[in-house]
A protein has these predicted regions:
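Subset of outer-membrane beta-barrel
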Residues: 19-246
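Bacterial Sec-dependent N-terminal signal peptides
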Residues: 1-23, 224
């Protein structure tokens, strides 16, 4: 059965922080991008394609394209793949990972444990700058590949789910040949949601995802969805809302 989803994202930039890792307001449809344990958690094969663009009227504005696929295999094994491409002005990052999960059957619920492996292709090309001269040694193109691994756990029951993951376990430098260079820092995700039946084939699906990066407040994604016959979803998401815990 085909499943259609509509999500209206309300972006509330109460505080502005540098965001190194793509954040997904549709994380329920890109779950194995941030949590490898989700690979194979659904009975059917899952393919997701999403695109996001900020400041659409500006040339070379930030944009993200994400693709994920996961499949339940034999012997409680799940496999998946995810590719995310981020473009921000002269910078391009492509994250490519393979996911593996194993299901522990706990009667009326399931616990999935997962690992992911892959890496980040990074490129910065100053030749697209209007001020580019071609002879300036400070305007050389940069490129690098940083391998990494990630891990996660996903618990699923008939009325709720809980997720914890660190999709990239190690900090990595954008360009290892430079003394001073930007770093991609470790991101931790904790989330959960519920399924609340209200009759007439309708189910309410509230969920919350928290993200933590060292040196920054916890950021949140609060989503409310209504599903009809488990085939059509509509909802609202409030994203990038900073949360500080003393």
């Amino acid at each position: 059965m085909k499943k259609y989803s509509l999500l209206i994202a309300l972006l509330l930039p109460l505080l502005i922080f540098g965001q190194q890792e793509s954040y997904y307001s549709l994380y329920r449809y890109n779950m194995n991008v941030i949590n490898p344990a989700y690979a194979g958690a659904e009975a059917a094969n899952m393919l997701s394609l999403t695109s996001r663009r900020q400041w659409a009227s500006m040339d070379d504005a930030p944009s993200t394209v994400a693709m994920s696929f996961s499949s339940a295999r034999e012997n409680n094994v799940g496999l998946g793949i995810s590719v995310v491409s981020d473009n921000v002005f002269i910078e391009q990052q492509t994250f490519a990972y393979v996911d593996f999960s194993y299901k522990l059957d706990m009667g009326e619920s399931q616990l999935y444990l997962g690992l992911k492996g892959g890496g980040n292709f990074y490129k910065a090309d100053p030749s697209s700058l209007s001020s580019y001269t071609g002879g300036d040694p400070t305007q050389v193109a940069l490129s690098s590949f940083n391998p990494n691994i990630g891990a996660g756990a996903y618990y699923s029951a008939s009325s709720f789910w809980v997720s914890f993951s660190i999709p990239r376990l190690f900090n990595s430098k954008r360009d290892g040949d430079l003394v001073v260079t930007a770093k991609d820092r470790v991101h931790s995700y904790v989330g959960g949601g519920a399924y609340i039946g209200i009759g007439n084939g309708l189910t309410v699906k509230p969920s919350l995802m928290l993200r933590k990066v060292k040196g920054l407040p916890i950021t949140t994604d609060l989503t409310g969805m209504v599903s009809w016959q488990n085939s059509f979803d509509v909802g609202v998401s409030v994203v990038n809302f900073p949360l500080t815990i003393a």
